[in-house]
Regions:
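N-terminal beta-strand motif that seeds the catalytic metal site of vicinal oxygen chelate
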Residues: 1-16, 75, 131-132
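Vicinal oxygen chelate
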Residues: 10-14, 75-116, 121
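Long, continuous compositionally biased terminal/linker segments
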Residues: 38-84
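Conserved beta-strand in the GNAT
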Residues: 54-60, 117, 126-130
């Protein structure tokens, strides 16, 4: 469905440290990291091992303007189990994320929807969900 998604950050090092640990809990691996101080380009991408796409990217905005977290914008990662949802959520909170909705069933979406919501260290809203 998606080629990639890009989430803007201001403090790249803090965001990179946060996502490196959180995405590891989802089984994603770092595909690349680019730091070009001269051009002020800092970005990184993760993927499922052995699969070229989709990519989850973080980076400073290319227009060099400050990053602003969007209201109503969210990235949702697919977990393989409810236990994985809980692990990712707990990892996110221990690494500086903030709660936007503890892990649990959300039957108003569908009977088996189990998700958790948090904000990353930059204020971006993130969801982790499984559908079993």
């Amino acid at each position: 469905m998606f080629s990639h998604t890009h989430t803007g950050v201001t403090d790249f090092e803090r965001a990179f440290a946060f996502y490196s640990v959180v995405l590891k809990e989802l089984g994603l691996v770092l595909r690349f990291r680019e730091d070009d101080e001269v051009a002020n380009i800092h970005w990184a991408g993760w993927q499922t091992p052995g699969v070229g796409r989709p990519l989850f990217l973080i980076g400073k905005p290319f227009d060099k303007a400050a990053h602003l977290a969007g209201n109503g914008q969210m990235v949702a990662f697919l977990a393989t189990s409810r236990a994985q949802v809980r692990r990712v959520y707990e990892t996110a909170l221990t690494k500086g994320g903030t709660c936007e909705g503890a892990p649990g069933l959300r039957p108003h979406y569908h009977a088996n929807y189990y998700g958790a919501y948090f904000r990353d260290t930059e204020g971006n809203k993130v969801c982790v969900a499984c559908h079993d």
